């Protein structure tokens, strides 16, 4: 599910920013084309809710590296506003249902915008089907 959410975030970013902004789902050591985005899942959690239902929380960090033009802070402020809008609702690739982003916040540090967002949902674990016994033999004493 994490990879599906990363893909869905990437699609939302591409729809908002277009082909001029490169989107990387993994860190790139060399050949980085700015401006660009990095998408990473930080702290996924899963807690038992009831029965076979679990509540899962996925915290993502979308890092934006602006083009070096001398106005990085202003550019990051504009990108932050667009991220609030385009990542509030994404379509999960797994089931096609919309999922809402919560706890959105942005930090600008060392020339990089870090945009944090949570996507939370309930999941139901399917039980593994165990074949039934065909026959049962028993002896009664007495």
Q: What are the residue ranges of the model-derived segments?
A:
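A short, hydrophobic beta-strand-centered structural micro-motif
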Residues: 33-42
């Amino acid at each position: 599910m994490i990879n599906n959410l990363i893909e869905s975030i990437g699609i939302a970013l591409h729809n908002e920013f277009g082909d001029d902004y490169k989107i990387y789902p993994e860190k790139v050591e060399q050949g980085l084309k700015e401006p660009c985005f990095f998408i990473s899942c930080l702290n996924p959690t899963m807690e038992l809710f009831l029965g076979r239902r679990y509540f899962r929380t996925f915290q993502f960090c979308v890092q934006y590296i602006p083009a070096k033009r001398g106005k990085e802070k202003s550019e990051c402020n504009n990108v932050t506003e667009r991220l609030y809008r385009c990542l509030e609702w994404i379509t999960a690739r797994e089931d096609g249902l919309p999922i809402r982003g919560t706890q959105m916040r942005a930090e600008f540090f060392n020339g990089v915008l870090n945009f944090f967002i949570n996507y939370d949902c309930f999941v139901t674990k399917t039980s593994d089907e165990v074949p039934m016994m065909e026959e049962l033999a028993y002896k009664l004493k007495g």
